[in-house]
Amino acid sequence: MGLETEKADVQLFMDDDSYSRHSSVDYADPDKFVDPGSDRDPHRLNSHLKVGFEDVIAEPVSTHSFDKVWICSHALFEMSKYVIYKFLTVFLAIPLAFAAGILFATLSCLHIWIIMPFVKTCLMVLPSVQTIWKSVTDVVIAPLCTSVGRSFSSVSLQLSHD
């Protein structure tokens, strides 16, 4: 149990080139990222995800593990992230994409054929409702408030200290 002063080089070789291209992306500066292949997140919807080893696991200067432990944990982290992600997408991507497609198709249909016609109908009816409401206010509510105000304005209180 001694202090190892040499910095070790960490390299991880994988067969899938597209994965190794994306493992060193600087998410803080999306302009530096130029993907020669197809961009699967063109609108940067998931740019907030930090899944790099250094973003998740960090050892302060005062507490360092052995370099071999650090290298092995880094390699295991990257490999398990790669394998588990691929495994989960094989079984979940197609059913979840199907469910999301059904959900968004249903929401789009409801919005287009029910919600927007209802909103437009309400907006068309509102000017006449506004005219009727103004008439009701002028005929019923304004005289009522005026008479209540006059009644309370004639009340006077006198306090005496006995």
Curated annotation (Swiss-Prot):
Membrane topology type: Peripheral membrane protein
Residue numbers carrying Phosphoserine: 20, 23
Cytoplasmic topological intervals: 1-86, 108-162
Coiled coil ranges: none
GO CC term (a single one): sarcolemma
Single GO molecular function: protein heterodimerization activity
Modified residues (Phosphotyrosine): 19, 27
Compartment(s): Nucleus; Cytoplasm; Golgi apparatus membrane; Cell membrane
Keywords per UniProt: Cell membrane, Cytoplasm, Golgi apparatus, Membrane, Nucleus, Phosphoprotein
Pfam families in UniProt: Caveolin
Protein name: Caveolin-2
